[in-house]
Amino acid sequence: TNLFKPMNKKEARAKFMLPEGKKLVLFGSLKITDKRKGVDYLIEACKLLAEKHPEWKESLGVVVFGNQSQQLQEQLPFHVYPLPYIKNEHEIVNIYNAVDLFTIPSLEENLPNMIMEAMACGVPCVGFNVGGIPEMIDHLHNGYVAQYKSSEDFANGIHWILTEPEYDE
């Protein structure tokens, strides 16, 4: 059987003590601070979203998994739920199923497994138009392909998924 598949969101959130009433955005990387992973663009996109949608400050959270995940707590305008780097595939499946969207602001990527895994779990993705990402994300269908290095368009992608009726629970 395929390990990566949609599961009960409430149960998945309970496993990581994540809140039920919030929309949760996921960002994960072995090393969060690696500039190639584009975390600065995610931070900037979140700041833009918080300015445009101040009401989201209470209703949106960011789940970050990876080494140095705690470092983002001070830099993001939304509540951050830091998790360590997770190698166990069953736990990774639960993380995908606990969130509302997966962000991959990488500045260089081939065919990122994390997009395939998230999508197999039914989670829409936002990524930049770089490497294999545009071949994996069907723009405005199962995710959003943002203009390369545009924090503003990345924010548009997060906003689109969070407000698209198809993805609203």
For the regions a protein language model found, what residue spans apply to each?
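Aromatic "clamp/platform" in nucleotide-sugar-dependent glycosyltransferases that forms part
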Residues: 107
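Short acidic/histidine- and often glycine-rich active-site loop of Leloir-type glycosyltransferases
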Residues: 116, 130-140, 144-145
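Short hydrophobic beta-strand element within catalytic cores of glycosyltransferases
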Residues: 124-127
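Short alpha-helical donor nucleotide-sugar binding micro-motif in glycosyltransferases
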Residues: 94-99
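A short helix/loop element that forms part of the nucleotide-sugar donor recognition site in Leloir-type
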Residues: 5-18
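Conserved donor-binding/catalytic core segment of Leloir-type glycosyltransferases
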Residues: 19-37, 43-47
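Nucleotide-activated donor-binding/catalytic signature segment of Leloir-type glycosyltransferases, i.e.
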Residues: 53, 57-61, 66-90
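Conserved acidic donor-binding segment of nucleotide-sugar-dependent glycosyltransferases
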Residues: 139-140, 144-151, 160-165
